[in-house]
């Protein structure tokens, strides 16, 4: 049997065709998510928000009801303009949600900048998130009394921050290994007492790892102290003593966590 060697130029061309063909492309994750985009007029008003965002659980045309909405804020590894990053972060939540028999919309936005590098102007911004939520309620069948917020690491900070300024948006929140300042884990917001008063109004479970060297669990203790000072009795601090910065994987992998979260409705 004879062996034929392709000339390098031909081989390179063949590989390029393969890479750009439907056969050679890496298929989109089979996670049921769709990528949607803010209208340009709204996107132009944002500070540090990718106009694209991930949506899961959108019902078929003709659906007349309302669904709960789970908002997931990614960590620092999700920052940028590659919407696949937050998509991959939120993917592991889908299985436990199914096991908990919870039908919900899930939206995962993307922050485009680092708050530390951009001196507080990057990362999660209240104005951006307010604009996004208003758009979601306008365009998706969202039950505004069943909006839930969670996030990991930088997204845990975003959860504290957004709910700390806008508690009326949410039925319950669950920050994971979240800092409490805009410039990183060692920073503390100047509005800690305000956050405490506002977070005291919400059911909250905040999760940390006892061995976390990135965001130490004492950040959670500080926010709990502020909530307690305001008379709050709905918040819990849960520390997994043997876990590090990956502590959020524990509740995110438990159907019982989602059953707790979705058991709440917004108080009017």
Model-assigned labels for residue ranges:
Residues 207, 213-268:
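C-terminal catalytic histidine-bearing segment of alpha/beta-hydrolase fold enzymes
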Residues 145-198:
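Primarily recognizes the serine-hydrolase "nucleophile elbow" in alpha/beta-hydrolase
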Residues 23-69, 190, 221-225, 235, ...:
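A domain-start/cap signature at the N-terminus of enzymes
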Residues 198-204:
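Short, proline-enriched alpha-helix->beta-strand connector loops that line the catalytic pocket
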Residues 62-67, 76-116, 182-183:
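Short substrate-entry loop that stabilizes the transition state in hydrolases
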Residues 73-75, 208:
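The conserved beta1-alpha1 loop
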Residues 119-140:
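Alpha/beta-hydrolase active-site loop
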């Amino acid at each position: 049997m004879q062996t034929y060697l392709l000339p390098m130029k031909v081989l390179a061309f063949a590989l390029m065709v393969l890479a750009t063909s439907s056969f050679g492309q890496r298929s989109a994750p089979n996670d049921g998510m769709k990528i949607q985009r803010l209208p340009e007029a709204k996107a132009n008003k944002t500070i540090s928000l990718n106009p694209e965002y991930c949506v899961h659980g959108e019902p078929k045309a003709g659906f007349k009801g309302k669904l709960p909405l789970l908002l997931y804020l990614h960590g620092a590894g999700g920052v940028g303009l590659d919407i696949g990053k937050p998509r991959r972060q939120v993917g592991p939540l889908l299985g436990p949600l199914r096991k908990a028999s919870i039908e919900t919309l899930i939206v995962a936005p993307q922050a485009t900048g680092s708050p530390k590098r951009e001196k507080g102007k990057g990362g999660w911004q209240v104005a951006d998130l307010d604009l996004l939520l208003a758009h979601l309620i306008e365009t998706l069948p969202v039950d505004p009394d069943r909006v839930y917020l969670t996030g990991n690491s930088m997204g845990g900070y975003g959860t504290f921050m957004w709910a700390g300024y806008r508690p009326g948006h949410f039925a319950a929140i669950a920050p994971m290994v979240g800092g409490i300042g805009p410039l990183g884990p060692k920073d503390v917001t100047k509005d800690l007492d305000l956050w405490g008063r506002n977070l005291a109004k919400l059911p909250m479970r905040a999760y940390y790892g006892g061995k976390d060297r990135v965001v130490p669990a004492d950040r959670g203790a500080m926010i709990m102290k502020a909530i307690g000072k305001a008379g709050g009795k709905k918040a819990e601090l849960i520390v997994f003593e043997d876990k590090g910065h990956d502590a959020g994987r524990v509740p995110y992998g438990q159907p019982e966590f989602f059953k707790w979260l979705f058991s709440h409705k917004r108080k009017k």
